[in-house]
Regions:
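Short, basic, glycine/proline-bearing loop/turn elements
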Residues: 67-69, 97-106
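His/Asp/Glu-enriched, well-ordered alpha-helical/loop segment
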Residues: 52-63, 99, 103, 114-168
């Protein structure tokens, strides 16, 4: 069993959302599983927020962040500051490469990046990264079949990260 969350659903009250999740998980001895930074935007900072709340609530090693896509939309210096926080929080990252690869195009101009968790930076930075799938044969991804080999292959090609020794 886990306690799951989606802070973006409580826009403007994300801290309260995370406080409730962490408190419920701590009281019940559960792990925490939170979907963060899904919109591929430099306006999102939920991964950082989750890492800080993990430390604040003493939940190190018990929290997984799913997606973390928007990290790629931030400057490298900020990303590495967040990686340091993730390590301090002993937080796990779950990348779901095909979940947002079709992110809608916008007219917003920014540094070039794709809508994939920056696994190619996280793994060498010493962050524990796993793969998952986020939508199985549903309205959003009708052809997704939960094949983790597909998820791995998409990440490999999208991030140009082929260091197999560090991926196993």
């Amino acid at each position: 069993d886990i306690v799951g969350g989606l802070p973006a659903k409580d826009f403007g009250r994300e801290d309260e959302h995370l406080d409730i999740l962490m408190s419920a998980a701590k009281e019940n001895g559960k792990l925490v599983h939170v979907h963060v930074d899904q919109f591929n935007s430099d306006e999102e900072r939920e991964t950082e927020q989750l890492a800080r709340k993990t430390i604040e609530h003493g939940m190190q090693g018990k929290v997984s962040a799913i997606h973390c896509i928007s990290l790629a939309a931030h400057p490298k210096k900020y990303r590495h500051e967040v990686y340091d926080l993730i390590r301090q929080a002993d937080m796990h990252i779950i990348s779901c490469p095909t979940a947002w690869i079709d992110h809608n195009r916008t007219e917003r101009l920014s540094v070039s990046h794709n809508s994939i968790t920056p696994v190619d930076e996280m793994v060498p930075a010493g962050i524990n990264v796993a793969f998952g799938t986020d939508n199985i044969c549903d309205i959003y991804k009708p052809f997704s079949d939960a094949d983790l080999w597909t998820e791995l292959r998409v990440m490999l090609e999208a991030c140009h990260y082929y260091d197999i020794e560090n991926l196993v």
